[in-house]
Amino acid sequence: MRGRTVSARRQTRRGEPFGHHGRPAEAFYLQKVGGTEAGIALGCRLVGEMLEKIEAGQRPLCLLRQAKQAQRALAGMSQEQLDKITAAIAAAAGEHARRLADMAVEETGFGKKEDKELKNRFAATTLYEAIRDEKTHGILAENREKRTIDIGVPVGIVAGLVPSTNPTSTVIYKSMICMKAGNPIIFSPHPSAVNCILETVNVVRRAAEGAGAPAGSISCITTPTLEATNALMRHDDTRLILATGGGAMVKAAYSSGTPAIGVGAGNGPAYIHHTADVRLAVKRILDSKTFDNGTICASEQSIVVERRMEGAVTAELKAQGAYLLDDEEHRLLSKFILRPNGTMNPAIVGKSVETVAKLAGLTRVP
């Protein structure tokens, strides 16, 4: 069987799946193997899966080759040239901030359009202002007394893993910080946010190339699969992974053998001290937790207070629009949001209070 498979592969022409004299790969496989109807179905499925895995593993390789060529050109650019590219990305992202936010919410069903837009603008404007004058290229600092010189050099090709909760803003800021330092970046999109991520990549890519960035500086896997992402993360030419997403994905990045910087859920408790301004503390906690329907990785998950503060904090929460559950409502909500294995029900992610209450059967929540 192994010899026949090799023979079939030799018949491949012009990148076609290994068929035989124009016939589909499945037909050739079945002609050689034969079998019952169940065997035929199994053969078709196995060949299809094998072809998909081969193709998925090849997609990142093409992007990596292009990125490697871009890396050589970026390495020869001056700080002024890199700054021009970064500025162009910021301007384009700001111009399309609302449209990209709308796309993200419509595709994923997560969050609020106005908050997604604010995140896009934060990445495009606030982040840009913070890094605009930072020197990343060449001699960064010199200490004559200690006889040391700090020299900035590109790290190389970066793999950018993008989540579905913050898809467009993540692409914007990762593109900016990579171009600022002269590093090509290849994005691996979350499967449930492919379209808005690809469109954001196109926006920043066109802006970057229009400002002088070489082709291949910013790219994206168009059909995300586990095989494609792993191939990208583990390739020798990938020098750094910027992983934003769930715990399993961040863990996979850390165990890939490539240096990685991971960002995942960090939704911890907020402690209100007895000396705090209760009104202001509650306002900030509610603003944080409700922003983009709680999709921010650092939005507060719970509130901790001293017993003597409980009444004041509870009253302030109600005054600012929070709804406090009674024991039965607490039971219903807990049963809905926590699955038997201890994980969270994904149906609540990025959804409004009204939607979560309805799904959990809470009829009194306004």
Residue ranges and their predicted role:
Residues 47-149, 177, 319:
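N-terminal Rossmann-like NAD(P)+-binding subdomain of aldehyde/semialdehyde dehydrogenases
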Residues 2-16:
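Compositionally biased, low-complexity flexible segments
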Residues 54-57, 172-173, 250-366:
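ALDH superfamily catalytic-core signature
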Residues 139-280:
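Rossmann-like NAD(P) dinucleotide-binding subdomain of oxidoreductase/dehydrogenase enzymes
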Residues 18, 28-29:
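Aromatic (phenylalanine/tyrosine) cluster motif
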Residues 68-71, 75-78, 89-97, 101-104, ...:
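Structural signal for hydrophobic packing residues in well-ordered secondary-structure cores
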